[in-house]
Amino acid sequence: MSQVLFHQLVPLQVKCKDCEERRVSIRMSIELQSVSNPVHRKDLVIRLTDDTDPFFLYNLVISEEDFQSLKFQQGLLVDFLAFPQKFIDLLQQCTQEHAKEIPRFLLQLVSPAAILDNSPAFLNVVETNPFKHLTHLSLKLLPGNDVEIKKFLAGCLKCSKEEKLSLMQSLDDATKQLDFTRKTLAEKKQELDKLRNEWASHTAALTNKHSQELTNEKEKALQAQVQYQQQHEQQKKDLEILHQQNIHQLQNRLSELEAANKDLTERKYKGDSTIRELKAKLSGVEEELQRTKQEVLSLRRENSTLDVECHEKEKHVNQLQTKVAVLEQEIKDKDQLVLRTKEAFDTIQEQKVVLEENGEKNQVQLGKLEATIKSLSAELLKANEIIKKLQGDLKTLMGKLKLKNTVTIQQEKLLAEKEEKLQKEQKELQDVGQSLRIKEQEVCKLQEQLEATVKKLEESKQLLKNNEKLITWLNKELNENQLVRKQDVLGPSTTPPAHSSSNTIRSGISPNLNVVDGRLTYPTCGIGYPVSSAFAFQNTFPHSISAKNTSHPGSGTKVQFNLQFTKPNASLGDVQSGATISMPCSTDKENGENVGLESKYLKKREDSIPLRGLSQNLFSNSDHQRDGTLGALHTSSKPTALPSASSAYFPGQLPNS
């Protein structure tokens, strides 16, 4: 039984007699063999072979007795069991140091003969240093005889055959896997082609879509740019006018100050004689001057904070301006819809005009606020300039006082006037701060007004949508009435007795039905509207509808509409239950003809445009609710002539048969 401890290539330095040293890589194997015949013992086998030369073979078998003699000869400090590991450590150090220019450990194979043939050789492990080469271990290796070489070659051949078999098996597996991968590759190529085609079509669609969106966005950006340029030019003109006014005021102020300066110089020359007497007062004046300087510094700080606040307010006003511009754009978009119904619904136009006026008023107020804020900032700048000028005047006066050391009574009065001016400027600054606070409150109020206008716009949008739905429903009812009238005129009419007709009509109302003023409730918009005669009589009296009077066959069907508004939470059941409505007959002579829409308004026009944006307060009871009844309805004697179509607004409700 053998245990392989080490088996790898090691760098080796070969030395032969009368030959140059050469470096080769030799495969070294270290095995620990256990022999139990006749006595159990362990032997250490060291073997050197060359992969390029199969006949190169050196062996060394070290038993425990041999190791003891070796230990005694070379002064080793390890036991037989620890010797293999220490020897392997030395070999690893030799391989690690081999790549260096000056290796610390060397592995040498020294032969006393000229050629490594059948002569023994010594394997030395040498440590090099600048002083001496120390040999840590020297082992004598014997060359292998023919039997050992044949045995070694047979083992190598056996290993190579086993390796060949394993490689053949791995080759077969690799070929199978290659075939499978080729098949999968072909399938994946097909899938890839499909995906490429789909991706190409998808990318083409996306490019077209994005190009269209890009053109739309470019147009919007150009419109916004033109609008912003106009606003910028207007603001620029206003600022130029304001700056010119400021320059004119400053020039006037400069002329006044120059005149005052001349007057002061004259007074200074007059008061040179009395300056020496006021040296005692000078110290007090200097202390007061320091105090005024501190006050001026505090005023500067407050002024800087006010500038920052003004800048923030300007930003906020700009944001409000952008919001107002967006609202104006939305109002313009809504104008296009309202223009379609301008002829029929004047009240909606008035509401829209009111909203536009409110928006314009808000914009004008914002412009005024911006102008006031700019004027306040200009006033603050003026105050800063005045303070700087006052400081310069004070410095010049102090220099003149130090040079002349005299101050006149008139100069004391001048200082008092300057202090009064400073106090006035402080008061002006306080007033400016209060006005800024007031303007902030006004801006907040304007913002609340803007929010209220936005809410009103949203409510008007919802109202327009509801009115559109109501108008479409009314158009549908008018078309149905026209169809019923045509069918009544074309079909053969029967004239039952008037008593039975009136009884039939009057008996069509059930006392338990949910009828509110003869109007159905529209479930989506919450607006009550009258039921057309065709709808009510088709659902309630499908077989008993007849004309009351046959003396007016050409008068046509007249429908009365009385638009009123109910609660928006009316259910569909109320609509279904309230479909039958009483139609009392008027016996008054003055109201002999039924009041309502004439037959010419019930004709369907091909060029008609559906009305949109019906307001809730469009029709009032005083203008559009009239006393009248339904005219003579000419119905066919055959009930099958009436088409039974489902309602567009009530999909689940079919006409009763």
UniProtKB/Swiss-Prot annotation:
Ubiquitinated by the SCF(FBXW5) E3 ubiquitin-protein ligase complex during S phase, leading to its degradation and preventing centriole reduplication. Ubiquitinated by the anaphase promoting complex/cyclosome (APC/C) E3 ubiquitin-protein ligase complex, leading to its degradation and preventing centriole reduplication. Residues 39-91 form the PISA domain. It is found in: Cytoplasm, Cytoskeleton, Microtubule organizing center, Centrosome; Cytoplasm, Cytoskeleton, Microtubule organizing center, Centrosome, Centriole. Keywords: Cell cycle, Coiled coil, Cytoplasm, Cytoskeleton, Disease variant, Phosphoprotein, Primary microcephaly, Ubl conjugation. The keyword Phosphoprotein applies. Its main location: cytoplasm. Gene3D superfamilies: Spindle assembly abnormal protein 6, N-terminal domain (2.170.210.20). The modification Phosphoserine is found at residues 510, 615, 657. Residues 492-510, 634-647 have a biased composition (Polar residues). Residues 166-471 form a coiled coil. Residues 487-510, 615-657 are annotated as: Disordered. Nine homodimers form a cartwheel structure with an internal diameter of 23 nm and radial spokes connecting to the microtubule triplets. Forms a complex with CPAP and STIL. Interacts with FBXW5. Interacts with NUP62 and TUBG1 at the centrosome. Interacts with CENATAC; the interaction increases with CENATAC acetylation. Interacts with FZR1; the interaction is regulated by CENATAC and leads to SASS6 proteasomal degradation. The 35 nM long coiled-coil domain mediates homodimerization while the globular N-terminus links the dimers at an angle of 40 degrees to form the inner ring. Central scaffolding component of the centrioles ensuring their 9-fold symmetry. Required for centrosome biogenesis and duplication: required both for mother-centriole-dependent centriole duplication and deuterosome-dependent centriole amplification in multiciliated cells. Not required for centriole formation in embryonic stem cells but necessary to maintain centriole architecture. Required for the recruitment of STIL to the procentriole and for STIL-mediated centriole amplification. Overexpression results in excess foci-bearing centriolar markers. This is Spindle assembly abnormal protein 6 homolog. It comes from Homo sapiens.
